[in-house]
């Protein structure tokens, strides 16, 4: 297997620190990096302007989020500052921030770089090719797979709707054969399957449908090494296959996550429509960071939201 480091939520400076830590401990063993450079994001076509991002958040969304917290006995102290601190998310998703992250990435001995929510930028493809680094792209539909293959990626990760995090609606069992058929015209592109894969029999089934291997993620969040909030880790272990939802409440794009009072609140009839990326993250990140901290200190209201 090949370990992949998820760096979507990190600044270029943080990424440098983390990759240096990895390099010091892997003793030359190969590893990969997963970034998030979406095709569609608010403010992409202009220079990064943090003040304009903050101004674009409707007051109603802020008040609704504060109301969710108050309903669980959590105050809103620090959320304004938290939104300012969360601007790194918008910066990372902006082309300028993405380029900074890629500059850091290619200074390290990564063997694979992956991107989600769109075709990798030309600069990623060119730098990767010059350094003999494989490029992977995550897709949730056969049409997306075709775009990625035409763009020149080396690996396509077909992630079914069961996948944790950002995902489409096509089930894994339907998506893998569809993408495998598309890639018959691109034999140089490898296919990995993802989405709800935990056991050996699920891996075997995925490969029987045409994938060369699998890409797993959520399953590792419950391991002893994972830095997952222990409250969330317990919820994941105890959850059944019916305890996840596909929600825009975290990032503004559909992502599969454990159902909680947080996701329920954003599905309520009185809830505002989640904002587009990255604005919804600026709303959710400071609130959920507070929930995460309080839940680990024993706050029952926060634990229900986590």
For each predicted feature, which ranges?
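Conserved active-site-proximal phosphate/metal-binding subdomains
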Residues: 48-65, 169-192, 198-306
